[in-house]
Swiss-Prot record:
Protein name: Transcobalamin-2
Keywords: Cobalt, Cobalt transport, Disulfide bond, Ion transport, Metal-binding, Secreted, Signal, Transport
Organism: Mus musculus
PANTHER family xrefs: TRANSCOBALAMIN-1/GASTRIC INTRINSIC FACTOR, TRANSCOBALAMIN-2
Organism lineage: Eukaryota, Metazoa, Chordata, Craniata, Vertebrata
Pfam family, one: Cobalamin_bind
Xref: InterPro entries: Cbl-bd_prot (IPR002157), Cobalamin_Transport (IPR051588)
Primary localization class, coarse: secreted
GO molecular function, one term: molecular carrier activity
Amino acid sequence: MELLKALLLLSGVFGALAEFCVIPRIDSQLVEKLGQRLLPWMDRLSSEQLNPSVFVGLRLSSMQAGTKEDLYLHSLKIHYQQCLLRSTSSDDNSSCQPKLSGGSLALYLLALRANCEFFGSRKGDRLISQLKWFLEDEKKAIGHNHEGHPNTNYYQYGLSILALCVHQKRLHDSVVGKLLYAVEHDYFTYQGHVSVDTEAMAGLALTCLERFNFNSDLRPRITMAIETVREKILKSQAPEGYFGNIYSTPLALQMLMTSPASGVGLGTACIKAGTSLLLSLQDGAFQNPLMISQLLPILNHKTYLDLIFPDCQASRVMLVPAVEDPVHISEVISVTLKVASALSPYEQTFFVFAGSSLEDVLKLAQDGGGFTYGTQASLSGPYLTSVLGKDAGDREYWQLLRAPDTPLLQGIADYKPQDGETIELRLVRW
């Protein structure tokens, strides 16, 4: 009895000191609508549209898609295994290169863990080796004195470390050290703004390493870096409640949910963030499958670290397709497209149906002549690679802005311009 009293006393003391990140419960119908938006994407099985994050998000949610999930994972396995085989032959594997490096391969490894799969075959060893080679190449690009940059970005670097850690694969201290150095020296700040999703991904990766006590010689730095990431995320909270922006908030919450903290207002911050997410869900802000897949876990009080010991027998509600709303005749709106950072400045107004995407506007402009653009597929949707014949160079990208200077938070396939808006495409460095 005395021991029980002592334990209760200790739990009371620690409970008073440490706060947990918990968000308010979201209405189950709103959550179900999110899951329903993923169902059509699970029917898209082409190599360009397969997205491991969709599978991971659904497996960490409170919902399931039945046989669709099995078929989707089967399609993922076939595609990645074929790409892996081609990478060792002389076949043209240009379409596979993005799949076998960085974020995409890391997400595929997370998808396998979400299905409770452990690596015990040569194919598994080759996948692990492929991702380790990617990190080695990125480490070399960063350089011994940290004067360079990853060939991709630190988000993919952190995600790759996380995926390997979840599979309980160790990495050399020098690889982990690059991520630690980046956290310690504010490398995730671009144009004066903290990249919250990059901070969060680094925090998740480092927390995984800490839990396994990997890279024990770096333990003090890892612990300090996790605290630094948490502090930066909390400081990034806007008055509206989100961290950075509404789309970086789910990953930020995943990181904050991984461990309690004291004296930083963690509980209050997470409640505010959860409230902002609720409002955004009611407004229909989450349409992109990648963003939805990052949001679903936290609505089920899960994070990517739950993939360390996944529960593949957990009861999940079966999703049914949403009933489509009757088609209404849309009004016609005007949208002006502007490009200033080009040899020949461009500005033209187009008339499109309300609800059209920015990509629809770009296609209309190109079909009309005098305007050209190029895109590349990614897990978050197509992104601009060239405008009016001008390709984005090294450490450059085509930024989307609502005039005069408001950056868009969505990509060309997701953003729906409003009547009278001017959308500027601006080439910027990062």
